[in-house]
Amino acid sequence: MSQPDMNQLMQQAQQMQAQLQEAQREIAASTVKGEAGNGLVTISVAGSGEVTDMEIDPKIVDPEDIDTLKDLLLGAFKDANQKLQTLAEEKMGPLSQGMSGLGF
């Protein structure tokens, strides 16, 4: 089996790096929205992980039942984080598979 040309490997590595940077830019420019309680609580999270917005339906705000609100907020945060992780895997997954062709 012949060894790959070093120039070809370098070119492939540079292409992969450019694709990786583009995927990272796309993720950073994205916003995902997590929700809980069928949309009673929604949380928007930027690709950087920063929470950018939160919406709480007033009908669930009950001073006598703060635990339910806390549970819904936590659920919305978890949902948003899961969606952000899925987005990153979708953008980065094909790139990591391509690295196997470079001998990594």
Curated annotation (Swiss-Prot):
Gene Ontology CC: bacterial nucleoid; cytosol
Subcellular location: Cytoplasm, Nucleoid
Key word DNA-binding present: yes
GO MF, one annotated term: DNA binding
Pfam families reported in the protein's UniProt record: YbaB_DNA_bd (PF02575)
Biological role: Binds to DNA and alters its conformation. May be involved in regulation of gene expression, nucleoid organization and DNA protection.
Annotated keywords: Cytoplasm, DNA-binding
Organism listed in the record: Corynebacterium jeikeium (strain K411)
The protein, known as: Nucleoid-associated protein jk2011
